Amino acid sequence: MVAVLARQGRELAKRLLLIQFSAVMVAAAVFAVAVNGDWGLSALVGGGIFVIANAVFAGCAFLFAGARALKMVAISFYTGEALKILITIVLFSVAYMYMQLELVPLKLTYLLALGINICAPVLFINNKK
């Protein structure tokens, strides 16, 4: 039963990450074609920062499941969230310091992935009774 609970969460996280990754790739391609390659690369980096950080969180969040592992579930969620924030800060710092990026597509695709993270779980809700 515990493995089933964790597996369901992992599957939902995989679906969400796939949707985010696909949206980032489409946005990067659109920016590259519509404006230029620098905008496409910047969009890819901005969205990639969010997707990578979110993947790390998902990996930590669904390590444990079940009532017996309640404390470990809470610890893994807090650890995952802390790592997500830290990775986001580090990756944005690296992007700003060592890459010549356009800020508009970088921020727009980051916000696109964030918006998907907020809105897409509604699509996964199953209202069948």
Curated annotation (Swiss-Prot):
Keywords: Cell inner membrane, Cell membrane, CF(0), Hydrogen ion transport, Ion transport, Membrane, Transmembrane, Transmembrane helix, Transport
GO CC terms, sorted: plasma membrane; proton-transporting ATP synthase complex
GO biological process, one term: proton transmembrane transport
Transmembrane segments: 16-36, 44-64, 77-97, 105-125
Subcellular location: Cell inner membrane
Purpose of the protein: A possible function for this protein is to guide the assembly of the membrane sector of the ATPase enzyme complex.
Protein known as: ATP synthase protein I
Annotated source species: Vibrio cholerae serotype O1 (strain ATCC 39315 / El Tor Inaba N16961)
